[in-house]
Amino acid sequence: MNLHEFQAKALFREHGIPVPEGVAVSDPAALGEAISSLGGDAWVVKAQVHAGGRGKAGGVRLVKGSRELEHAVGELLGGRLATHQTGPAGLPINTVLVESLTDIGRELYLSLLVDRARRRVAIMASAAGGMDIETVAAESPEKIITLHVDPAAGYMPYQGRRVAFALGLEGPQVSALVKLLGQLYRLFVDSDASLVEINPLVVTKTGELIALDAKINLDDNGLYRHQALAELRDETQEDAREARAREHELNYVRLDGNIGCMVNGAGLAMATMDLIKLHGGEPANFLDVGGGTTAARVAEAFKLILSDEAVKAVFVNIFGGIVRCDLIAEGIINAVKEVHVTVPVVVRLEGTNVDQGKQMLAESGLNIITAESLTDGARRVVASVQ
């Protein structure tokens, strides 16, 4: 789950991490109060969407005077912002963040994330702040500093000093970064985050460290421990199908192809997509219906897949380990009838009661193609859309 910048900065403030003075505005009528609260005669207006590249797309604007501020807020609120991360449709702008200006001396990069290979929290830092960190990693990997935090010991001040020296900080700035990293680590652990990023972390001309931007991604598996954070979810920033899938305990990710996939098990789902690609097809989605698949869940999965108009065929690949194949076949038949599926459906079943399941599909009288193997199923479904 992603947080908006203004939500992330609110958490930063709670943990003592310095951020610019700012006010989140969702209604233009609240601008007067925001101006009074912030003071000054120049501000930065930032569109609040779950995507990077906002500045290049016109979503971050420097304004002078209340008239320019009103114009910028009026243009952004209620519109959509398309960046290189959103696709051409963009994301809706329901809130803007109005902030006081910061006197920037240097721009740095700082983040904490989960390194799954090392099973540790990784601290990443770079003197090339304000840039796309993926670009820095690809073009100048030597500019990125990476340290790992031992989960038993936790963050240690010496690690902060190593980062500070590598970034070229001096004097009080070293102590400030050591403290800031400790606060970031505590926030990361306390909120079950998967990523906490500051880009840029600025050194002002007076030598202060300020988080000019803030990005927090939370681990969905830990949200049950953080009800207040879970309530910050903005579903308008998410794919509507993915939100609907969550309600029915389905793991769904939309892709760009035309072959819908329904599989039980994440590993089998990925293997299924690989084979579709291998045979010249393009998966329209990743969909894991889970181990305890039921007829109702299968029906909902069909509805979800077919709500994508790009889908021209569906490949159902189920291994009946926890559930019996005859029950799965019954669910598929009922779902095809209920949803009025008009595209070809290729089904590959394997496991408990597989013969009964295949017989039920064959006798259903529906447009269901039974595959003998995973490879056979991939070939058949790709052929059906060509």
From Swiss-Prot:
Q: What is its EC number?
A: 6.2.1.5
Q: Which cofactor does it need?
A: Mg(2+)
Q: How is the cofactor bound?
A: Binds 1 Mg(2+) ion per subunit.
Reactions catalysed: succinate + ATP + CoA = succinyl-CoA + ADP + phosphate; GTP + succinate + CoA = succinyl-CoA + GDP + phosphate
Which parts of the sequence bind ATP? 46, 53-55, 99, 102, 107
What's any GO biological process attached to this entry? succinyl-CoA metabolic process
- Pathway of this protein? Carbohydrate metabolism; tricarboxylic acid cycle; succinate from succinyl-CoA (ligase route): step 1/1
Enumerate the spans annotated as ATP-grasp domain: 9-244
**InterPro entries assigned to the protein according to its UniProt record, in alphabetical order:** ATP-grasp, ATP-grasp_succ-CoA_synth-type, ATP_grasp_subdomain_1, Succ-CoA_synthase_bsu_CS, SUCC_ACL_C, Succ_CoA_ligase-like_bsu, Succinyl-CoA_synth-like
Gene Ontology MF terms: ATP binding; magnesium ion binding; succinate-CoA ligase (ADP-forming) activity; succinate-CoA ligase (GDP-forming) activity
Residues that bind substrate: 264, 321-323
Q: Which UniProt keywords apply?
A: ATP-binding, Ligase, Magnesium, Metal-binding, Nucleotide-binding, Tricarboxylic acid cycle
Q: Extract one GO cellular component term from the record.
A: cytosol
Keyword Ligase assigned to the entry: answer is yes
Does the keyword Repeat feature in the UniProt annotation?
no
Q: What does this protein do?
A: Succinyl-CoA synthetase functions in the citric acid cycle (TCA), coupling the hydrolysis of succinyl-CoA to the synthesis of either ATP or GTP and thus represents the only step of substrate-level phosphorylation in the TCA. The beta subunit provides nucleotide specificity of the enzyme and binds the substrate succinate, while the binding sites for coenzyme A and phosphate are found in the alpha subunit.
Task: Describe the subunit structure.
Answer: Heterotetramer of two alpha and two beta subunits.
Q: What is this protein called?
A: Succinate--CoA ligase [ADP-forming] subunit beta
Tell me the organism's taxonomic lineage: Bacteria, Pseudomonadati, Pseudomonadota, Gammaproteobacteria, Chromatiales
